[in-house]
Amino acid sequence: YEIGSGLVGSEMCIRDRIKPIMKDEAFLAIKSVPATKMDTQVAQDLKDTLQAYSDQCVGMAANMIGVSKNIIIFAIGPAQIVMYNPKITKKSRPYKVKEGCLSLEGERNTTRYENITVVYQDESFKKCKQSYSGFIAQIIQHEIDHCNGIII
């Protein structure tokens, strides 16, 4: 919060929850630990931070805001989807792609899969299983790599 910023009420609260982006590759290379119901504030911080960077970014993992928890978020249009403890259980149709990341400089080559199936817990910590394809699948793979300490 900056004095004289003109922000009031809830705008100040949201601005306070926007977290700086972690750029320390040694920290980003650490595998995240499982998330619990005690980590809902981390998910809220991810929502606020992703919204603040929506012109540059479509997904984030908790370690990108300095929290080593297994939580990711991604945007599908205006909707933000949070996944706790996501794991890819099935993948098919590999392809090569260059990706960028707010935490890293430039773009890097990586392999992604056109189709994936993910098991995860939703925001109510209900177990879910969902299949994704295309660009959304690519985003999810990138963010799960973050949780696993894999840097593109």
Could you tell me what each predicted segment is?
Residues 10, 15-152:
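Positively charged
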Residues 1-11:
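Positively charged, low-complexity/disordered segments
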